[in-house]
From Swiss-Prot:
Keywords: Cytolysis, Host cell inner membrane, Host cell lysis by virus, Host cell membrane, Host membrane, Membrane, Transmembrane, Transmembrane helix, Viral release from host cell
Domain of life: Viruses
Record organism: Enterobacteria phage P21 (Bacteriophage 21)
Protein known as: Antiholin
The encoding gene: S
Main location: host cell
Length: 71
């Protein structure tokens, strides 16, 4: 049989997750569809920019390795 501390820990985590889920859904209801569209556009632009910076970083590292090897 499970010990009481494991049962109470599970109940506490379940209650916390349920409460967080409830408040998250309440927050989602306050955002209008046009605001979600703006969030989506801005999010995709930020993600594209981060992808560009990551690619640039690894290209610079590759170029430095090639220069160090004399290629």
């Amino acid at each position: 049989m499970k010990s009481m501390d494991k049962i109470s820990t599970g109940i506490a985590y379940g209650t916390s997750a349920g409460s967080a889920g409830y408040w998250f859904l309440q927050w989602l209801d306050q955002v209008s569809p046009s605001q979600w569209a703006a969030i989506g556009v801005l999010g995709s632009l930020v993600l594209g920019f981060l992808t560009y910076l990551t690619n640039l970083y690894f290209k610079i590292r590759e170029d430095r390795r090639k220069a160090a090897r004399g290629e």
